Amino acid sequence: MAIEQTAITRATFDEVILPIYAPAEFIPVKGQGSRIWDQQGKEYVDFAGGIAVTALGHCHPALVNALKTQGETLWHISNVFTNEPALRLGRKLIEATFAERVVFMNSGTEANETAFKLARHYACVRHSPFKTKIIAFHNAFHGRSLFTVSVGGQPKYSDGFGPKPADIIHVPFNDLHAVKAVMDDHTCAVVVEPIQGEGGVTAATPEFLQGLRELCDQHQALLVFDEVQCGMGRTGDLFAYMHYGVTPDILTSAKALGGGFPVSAMLTTAEIASAFHPGSHGSTYGGNPLACAVAGAAFDIINTPEVLEGIQAKRQHFVDHLQKIDQQYDVFSDIRGMGLLIGAELKPQYKGRARDFLYAGAEEGVMVLNAGPDVMRFAPSLVVEDADIDEGMHRFAHAVAKVVGA
């Protein structure tokens, strides 16, 4: 039966898409830099960045060129073969980090799934089949597959799907004593976000991460850093572990890695990687030439002094605006995070209303995020212009006034 061609509107979403999202009422159709336009031509300043993904803004010329060039050359061949863009990107990541081996996937979930499987398998073949315990943290977020959502410490995402993978223990974030209480020689891995993004934009303390490193060494467990949201320049270092001076055994990256093109990576050492062999894990699309070509172009720009050394000044620009808004409207109890991953916690009288501020922002022409019901989150382009920060925060101030005055 022929399908009648009708206009695409927000109502179309409710008619055809699985109801796992509740998207905004407007549909973005064009982006350039830190600005977005919807179907009606309304302009928005983008401080959401596709949830910390569009690290170089929308339609960056270098990324567009990389995509067009690769798109005219080779799209897909699977991992029955390798390809030049994947090998180039792998070499760049290894040369810039602690890692000696890398594997590419398509999403943060897949990178974390790979990391958790590797940690379990490494413990099994190198130590004992009973060394299976994974220690993770309350309010963590590691993905949506059954394994990764179970390692994530938020029951609202993991309950209701039947039996969960076993031997996963959650303890409070930044509480080293709680980790010590459950850590033993049956532990195969400790999994942690250096900055909890979805969990409220809460940064780990240096003492906490250093303590985790020492405990993992003591119990022959692997330290896994999930840098899906906080990595690729967002903190002002290429990866957050560099800021802390604590080197993990396994690191995962996604989001900003592709600048908007779906791609992820898991990085580790040669010795740990050797626990896997052909067939241990895999992906049809992982390491896709299109994705890796775009990611390589993004990497070449992000991993430069011009970008990384400008992050802190841009952060301060945001913080200055947030402090002025707070002085005027008395709305934030804390402004936190690191680099251009910024959280603004709402005061008690506004608890649970983060989405009200988000929706008001959209009405005023600025796109922001929430991190739970009580925290506003900002994850803009790493090269956002000062004029965009000023204009976007001016609009956000109007949004705050609207909510506070409601």
Swiss-Prot record:
Pyridoxal 5'-phosphate binds at residues 108-109, 141, 226-229, 284. Pathway: Amino-acid biosynthesis; L-arginine biosynthesis; N(2)-acetyl-L-ornithine from L-glutamate: step 4/4; Amino-acid biosynthesis; L-lysine biosynthesis via DAP pathway; LL-2,6-diaminopimelate from (S)-tetrahydrodipicolinate (succinylase route): step 2/3. Its EC number is 2.6.1.11, 2.6.1.17. The keyword Lipoprotein does not apply. It is an enzyme of class 2 (transferase). Homodimer. This is Acetylornithine/succinyldiaminopimelate aminotransferase. The gene is argD.
